[in-house]
Amino acid sequence: FCGFFALIIVGIPTLTVIQANRRKMQYLPPRVSIEGRGIKRGLTAVESAILMEQPLDKVMTMILFGVIKKNAAEVVTRDPLKIKSASPIPDGLHEYELNFLRAFKEESAKTRRGLLQQMMVKLVQLVSEKMKGFSRRETLDYYKAIMEKAWQQIEAADTPEVKSQKFDEALEWTMLDKNYDDRTRRVFREPMYAPTWWGRYNPTHIPASSKPTVASAPFQTSGQPVSSSGRSALPGADIAAQMVTGVQTFSSKVVGNVNTFTEKITGATNPPPKPTSSGGSGGGRSGGGCACACACAGCACACAGGGR
């Protein structure tokens, strides 16, 4: 029996640590989980990602793609990641997109990270406010269906041009897929045309034509239909790989340790409950600890007052 109880003694602290780490990643306030009625329509893909509690480095990559597609920014260098805002800033950007661009005006990595944390706190609070009175479960199902439909349209495209167009239109929605990395690599095996905004995301991209193209000219409108005129068909695997590494770039080059970054957000939006004290106020924890002395074979270790 000693081995069994030793396993329990070792296992409980390990499980506690795992649960504590998982708790730090849950940045949505508890009230969002209180079931209301009906679907909250009108959320953006980024807001839907927050509702799904997607990793925050992925959420910020979605914001990056959003401002690039809207001609509000371009990537100057990938390593280190430097972003140049358009001048003037286009109308119609969301507050979180404006805050994102403001953060990247800062040269200091520490200052930029702090501003990105503030941006994420405001975004989580915004989604929490929008979800008041609505069903999170029904809303999640609704946006997961949108995500799946976006992928189906891309997968059903019968030409590289159509596939590129569908991908361009639905990029942020496809990123809601938990298997985004694998699915992107699987779907884009054949050659495809780079999205019209590709030159603003990939500063090393050289268009096939020597003439200025939509893909190479910064801050040109990206709402034009996809055309192969003046654009090169690139290996789909290359495009897929660069989309996936965009998330990895945010993790390693901008956010740093994503767990530490997220923990700071959670501390502001979903802080852990304050411990309640019962009984005496001695140096140890009252009523919540479990001190077992397991001596030898056949002993029974009884923990009183420590269970939940």
Residue ranges and their predicted role:
Residues 1-308:
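Acidic, Ser/Thr/Pro-rich intrinsically disordered cytosolic tails and loops
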